């Protein structure tokens, strides 16, 4: 807006086209390149320093040192200089402050210092030295309240003295030239032009930047300085305390690496920036000379007090990299593309298996034949002492996840059985028993005999052996002093150990026979159920592994054989990632296993290493059916609003995962819709707006009765975010739901300088920022001011048309009458759920004829008669189906037989490509399957509710808060 010429054709005053030179082109005044002319001209020898100089207020006194030159250094000061070329003699040089826009105008700030008066510096040059320096120039900052007053006086003075009025005030005043007396009287017309120009330029003036305009006047024949040379304009000078004038600098980031998929939150501290004029740029210079760049995602509400930015990383150009990629990150100002010094940033490959489920599945599976190769290791399938599969005796190389060397189990492969010992009278031969722990720790190797004493002396039928705990020994038991005692003791313990081994072998043999008879694997598991508490190198128990490898029946068998004994210990056992079996069942999407675990008492309240409960995990993955199972548990209620380690509730994660079904389940289960996440106080509605998800935002407002003006810790409402991001759809939705565009957050609207308070100017409390102040475009600004939302349609946006128009008005009336019955299984609300429009049920209830409103919505969204028939069939509503069938019966059909459902399905319907397009639109972000976007695009509530009622009220604020916001026919 500031770059447009406010005085062009069509304005109050017409441009004087007789002017032959382009007085409005700032590029005309090349600062340092000499003009191609034979006569006198003015040239800038040294530019002023652009940054680092502070504009001072009246109360602060003069500047400490004048405006330095561009080449000024600490020990070598320099100042702006100009030279009058091709001329020697007396001259007068004036310096005026002008704006930095495309069109040059007078600036309201004033030059102060030696030779300065009324904001203008006047210096004489010559007659010999035609170089003029300005060693003590200062810039006086005018307050906002006095901009118009000061600017009008400055313009009047320029017109009276003839100091470039046609250029700096208005083109219609170009005829006013410098006069010797300087006491010209202005006409009323000239004063009006000045006033209008001052009004317009006051609105557009940037108080943080100025330029110096140098104009030289040579004497005429009378000695008066009236011969004006073409002025020259310096580079821009930025106020050092203005946000857009400071040097950009990254001070600190809490992370310097992120995943290639982007979307990770980073906190960045920086020097002063302007929240609506800053970008965070990621870039990489490629080998072929190209440059990849991406920009951090944040809105003005994510910039805190001009010194901190919270943003999300962009996606890297290649998300399939196999090794880290180094890029750079820097701040960049939008207005002038000024950048900060780049900092390194590392993109690492995507970790697709964060829960390590796939890694564990990829382990080498145990091979059955490995158990018969060496003869020294324990056999598979129960052939060894503890029936460890996976090739797994302690003397062999245990298979991953199956050999538990840390327990130091001794091998018993040398034992054979004779008839008379087992049920089958198979004999036993006492072979050599090696009782040394070859795979155990050093301390355990010496204590194998002592450990055998820990076995129970007598086991009852059906109980397994106690687990050896050799590794807990810290010191070997003192042995007898004589060799004879030691040999006797060793012999006794060998005999005792052999006896226990035989008892254990007998039990396993019995279990094997029972399995052969019944075919029930639980017969084998029962004798080893005490070992289900053993964990592998990852901390996983057999129950963890069975779930990871999707063996649902094995999980059920394990739960059955351990029921009532050690069930609680293994059901809620955590692995090294703090995952319980229930966590893994949710992660691997096994609904039946989740139900089995809950039935035997799995604890929902246990959290994983990130503080996630099973509700968080189900919502994150969008498993609505599993989430439904979990929410049915009585123990789920206290966890619904429990935050995880990131401070997020399950409802927040459902929104961030774009899962409408999970969100609906949580709302129905009583989740606190207005709960704040613990980092910045955002509610689920804030997050839906932040993710530009109109579907979820509509669900929260319509189904969850979300507080539309809920605030974060810094007072930001969802409307602030929508306005700052320029989202017209969400701004319209929130405004229609009653959002207040005048709510102020805690971010100051402007930076109040301390000196203003000292000067008594602009005193008082600095106002906060409202959504109106943050409107990123005119469309949002108009919506916030009450203008109806009018979306711009493209060919891709046009909704596909269904065939509902084939139903006659009489048929529609009969259907609506049938759908108004109170039976919950056959009324309009149930049909709406079947048709995917259930989220609008609350809105439908506000209508005098909900069933008619439903049918109108369904037609607008491209619904077909086929889908309507299928929905009615699912409801079992034969009367409604017959009404539709009757509408398509021909006389011949009526005389012969009624039309079948299959025949109705053969009626003219929309093409398959059209239906596919409908499904794509419903699944996309732009058109939600909830029907909210459909309502925004096509639905006129004026037509669908009563036919003439203009408003549908959607009051989604707490009772007694604010005012109701109506949704009009067009938003």
Swiss-Prot record:
S-(15-deoxy-Delta12,14-prostaglandin J2-9-yl)cysteine lipid sites: 59
ANK repeat extents: 538-567, 577-606, 610-639, 646-675, 680-710, 714-743, 767-797
GO molecular function: actinin binding; chromatin binding; DNA binding; DNA-binding transcription activator activity, RNA polymerase II-specific; DNA-binding transcription factor activity; DNA-binding transcription repressor activity, RNA polymerase II-specific; identical protein binding; RNA polymerase II cis-regulatory region sequence-specific DNA binding
Residue segments, region GRR: 370-392
Annotated site residue numbers, Cleavage (when cotranslationally processed): 431-432
(3S)-3-hydroxyasparagine modifications at: 674
Induction of synthesis: By phorbol ester and TNF-alpha.
Disulfide pattern: none
Interaction with CFLAR: annotated span: 433-971
Motif Nuclear localization signal boundaries: 358-363
N6-acetyllysine: modified positions: 438
Pfam families: Ank, Ank_2, Death, RHD_dimer, RHD_DNA_bind
Annotated ranges, domain Death: 801-888
Record's comment on post-translational modification: Generation of the NF-kappa-B p50 (Nuclear factor NF-kappa-B p50 subunit) transcription factor takes place both cotranslationally and post-translationally via non-mutually exclusive mechanisms. A cotranslational processing allows the production of both p50 and p105 (Nuclear factor NF-kappa-B p105 subunit) from a single NFKB1 mRNA. While translation occurs, the particular unfolded structure after the GRR repeat region acts as a substrate for the proteasome, promoting degradation of the C-terminus.
Segments of this protein annotated with the region Essential for interaction with HIF1AN: 646-680
PROSITE patterns: ANK_REP_REGION, ANK_REPEAT, REL_1, REL_2
GO terms classed as biological process: antibacterial innate immune response; apoptotic process; B cell receptor signaling pathway; canonical NF-kappaB signal transduction; cellular response to angiotensin; cellular response to cytokine stimulus; cellular response to dsRNA; cellular response to interleukin-17
Comment field on protein domains: The C-terminus of p105 might be involved in cytoplasmic retention, inhibition of DNA-binding, and transcription activation. Glycine-rich region (GRR) is a critical element in the generation of p50 (Nuclear factor NF-kappa-B p50 subunit) by acting as a proteasomal 'stop signal', which leads to limited proteasomal degradation of the C-terminus, while generating p50.
Name of this protein: Nuclear factor NF-kappa-B p105 subunit
Source species of the chain: Mus musculus
């Amino acid at each position: 807006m500031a770059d447009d010429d406010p005085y062009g054709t069509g304005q109050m005053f017409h441009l004087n086209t007789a002017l032959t030179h382009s007085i409005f082109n700032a590029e005309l005044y090349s600062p340092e390149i000499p003009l191609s002319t034979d006569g006198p001209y003015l040239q800038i020898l040294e530019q002023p320093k652009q940054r680092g100089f502070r504009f001072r207020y009246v109360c602060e006194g003069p500047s400490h040192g004048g405006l330095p030159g561009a080449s000024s250094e600490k020990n070598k000061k320099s100042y702006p200089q100009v030279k009058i070329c091709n001329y020697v003699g007396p001259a007068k040089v004036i310096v005026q402050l002008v704006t930095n826009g495309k069109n040059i105008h007078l600036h309201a700030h004033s030059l102060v210092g030696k030779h300065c008066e009324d904001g203008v510096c006047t210096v004489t040059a010559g007659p010999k030295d035609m170089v003029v320096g300005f060693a003590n120039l200062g810039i006086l900052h005018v307050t906002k309240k006095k901009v118009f007053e000061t600017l009008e006086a400055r313009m009047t003075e320029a017109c009276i003295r003839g100091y470039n009025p046609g250029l700096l005030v208005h083109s219609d005043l170009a005829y006013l030239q410098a006069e010797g007396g300087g006491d010209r009287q202005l006409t009323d017309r000239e004063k009006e032009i000045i006033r209008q120009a001052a009004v317009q330029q006051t609105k557009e003036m940037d108080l943080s930047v100025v330029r110096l305009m140098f104009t030289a006047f040579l004497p005429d024949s009378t000695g008066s300085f009236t011969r004006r040379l073409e002025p020259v304009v310096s580079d821009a000078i930025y106020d050092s305390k203005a946000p857009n004038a400071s040097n950009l600098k990254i001070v600190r980031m809490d992370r310097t690496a992120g995943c290639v998929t982007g979307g990770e939150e980073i906190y960045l501290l920086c020097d002063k920036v302007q929240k609506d004029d800053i970008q965070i740029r990621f870039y990489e210079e490629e080998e072929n000379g190209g440059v990849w760049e991406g920009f951090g995602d944040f809105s003005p509400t994510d910039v805190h007090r001009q010194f901190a930015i919270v943003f999300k990383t962009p996606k890297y150009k290649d998300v399939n990299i196999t090794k880290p990629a180094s890029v750079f990150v820097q701040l960049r100002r939008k207005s002038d593309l000024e950048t900060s010094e780049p900092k390194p940033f590392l993109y690492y490959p995507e970790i697709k298996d964060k829960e390590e489920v796939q890694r564990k599945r990829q382990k080498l599976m145990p091979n059955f034949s490995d158990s018969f190769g060496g003869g020294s290791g324990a056999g598979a399938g129960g052939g060894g002492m503890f029936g460890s599969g996976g090739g797994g005796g302690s003397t062999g190389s245990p298979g991953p996840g199956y050999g538990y060397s840390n327990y130091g189990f001794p091998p018993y492969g040398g034992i054979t059985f004779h008839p008379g010992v087992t049920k089958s009278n198979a004999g036993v031969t006492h072979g050599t028993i090696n009782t040394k722990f070859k795979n155990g720790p050093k301390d355990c190797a010496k204590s194998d005999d002592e450990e055998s004493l820990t076995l129970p002396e007598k086991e009852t039928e059906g109980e397994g052996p106690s687990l050896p705990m050799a590794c807990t020994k810290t010191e070997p038991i003192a042995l007898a002093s004589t060799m004879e005692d030691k040999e006797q003791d060793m012999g006794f313990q060998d005999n005792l150990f052999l006896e226990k081994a035989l008892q254990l072998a007998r039990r396993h043999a019995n279990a094997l026979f029972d399995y052969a008879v019944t075919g029930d694997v639980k017969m084998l598991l029962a004798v080893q159920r005490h070992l289900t508490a053993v964990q592998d190198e990852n901390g996983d128990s057999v129950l963890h592994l069975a779930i990871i490898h999707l063996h649902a029946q094995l999980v059920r068998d394990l739960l059955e054989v351990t029921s009532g004994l050690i069930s609680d210990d293994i059901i809620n056992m955590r692995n090294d990632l703090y995952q319980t079996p229930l966590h893994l069942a949710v992660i691997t999407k096994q609904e039946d296993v989740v139900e089995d675990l809950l039935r035997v008492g799995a604890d929902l309240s246990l959290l994983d290493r990130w503080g996630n409960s099973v509700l968080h995990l189900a919502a994150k993955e969008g498993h609505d059916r599993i989430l439904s199972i979990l929410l049915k548990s009585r123990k789920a209620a206290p966890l619904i609003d429990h935050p995880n380690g990131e401070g997020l509730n399950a409802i927040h994660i459902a929104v961030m995962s774009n899962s409408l079904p999970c969100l609906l389940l949580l709302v129905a289960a009583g989740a606190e819709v207005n709960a704040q996440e613990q980092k910045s106080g955002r509610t689920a509605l804030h997050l839906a707006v932040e993710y530009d998800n109109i579907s979820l935002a509509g669900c929260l407002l319509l189904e969850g009765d979300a507080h539309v003006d809920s605030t974060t810790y810094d007072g930001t409402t969802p409307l602030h975010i929508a306005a700052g991001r320029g989202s017209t759809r969400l701004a319209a939705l929130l405004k229609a739901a009653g959002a207040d565009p005048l709510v102020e957050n805690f971010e100051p609207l402007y930076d109040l300088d301390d000196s203003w308070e000292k000067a008594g100017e602009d005193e008082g409390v600095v106002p906060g920022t409202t959504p109106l102040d943050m409107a990123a475009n005119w469309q949002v600004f108009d919506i916030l001011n009450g203008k109806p939302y009018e979306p711009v349609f493209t060919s891709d946006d046009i909704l596909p048309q269904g065939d509902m128009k084939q139903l006659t008005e009489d048929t529609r009336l009969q259907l609506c009458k049938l759908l108004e019955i109170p039976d919950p299984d056959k009324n309009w609300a149930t049909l709406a759920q079947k048709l995917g429009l259930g989220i609008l049920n609350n809105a439908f209830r506000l209508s005098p004829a909900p069933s008619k409103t439903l049918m109108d919505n369904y037609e607008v969204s491209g619904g077909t008669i086929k889908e309507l028939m299928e929905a009615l069939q699912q409801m079992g509503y034969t009367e409604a189906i017959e009404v539709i069938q009757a509408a398509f019966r021909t006389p011949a059909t009526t005389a012969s037989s009624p039309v079948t459902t299959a025949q109705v399905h053969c009626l003219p319907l929309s093409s398959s490509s059209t239906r596919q397009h409908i499904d794509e639109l419903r699944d996309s972000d732009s058109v939600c399957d909830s029907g909210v976007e459909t309502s925004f695009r096509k639905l006129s509530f004026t037509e669908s509710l009563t036919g003439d009622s203009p408003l549908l009220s959607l009051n989604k604020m707490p009772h007694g808060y604010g005012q109701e916001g109506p949704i009009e026919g067009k938003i």
